[in-house]
């Protein structure tokens, strides 16, 4: 029986990032997620101590959904793929980004944008994951009209 009290996660920092094993919505000492090496986790920063170690949480004040249902806001990300992007664009992506709304017209997908320069994308087709990622990256350089042409061509909707 595994009795891990915490996980060390790589969030792209030079310091440790620690996630308590019961810091998931609805988790207890007896019922908690079992993360494995290589698992992708959507979490948020809870605090940073004086040694610059980052403490993470997968609990959400806004949602009462638990990790065990798979419906919680934060937690283990199943399937999909992680891509990297320039973290300087984090706020642009998170703050009313039109490209993400527009992409919904071309395919169904799930998306998690990290402030650490990581983006997780999950769609039914692997090639759509790549198209979504390319579209998001291209949106930093193109205006709305150029993006519309690009999306139609990329998703063969001309």
Give the location of each predicted region.
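Single-stranded RNA-binding regions, centering on S1/OB-family and related RNA-binding modules
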Residues: 2-44, 48-158
């Amino acid at each position: 029986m595994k009795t891990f009290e915490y996980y060390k996660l790589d969030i792209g920092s030079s310091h440790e990032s620690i996630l308590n094993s019961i810091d998931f919505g609805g988790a207890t000492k007896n019922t908690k997620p079992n993360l494995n090496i290589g698992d992708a986790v959507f979490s948020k920063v809870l605090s940073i101590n004086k040694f610059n170690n980052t403490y993470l949480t997968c609990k959400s004040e806004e949602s009462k959904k638990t990790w065990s249902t798979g419906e919680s806001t934060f937690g283990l990300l199943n399937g999909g793929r992680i891509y990297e992007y320039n973290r300087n664009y984090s706020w642009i992506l998170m703050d009313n980004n039109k490209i993400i709304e527009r992409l919904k017209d071309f395919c169904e997908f799930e998306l998690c944008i990290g402030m650490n320069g990581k983006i997780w994308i999950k769609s039914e087709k692997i090639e759509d994951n790549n198209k979504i990622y390319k579209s998001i990256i291209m949106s930093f350089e193109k205006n709305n009209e150029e993006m519309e042409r690009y999306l139609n061509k990329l998703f063969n909707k001309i």
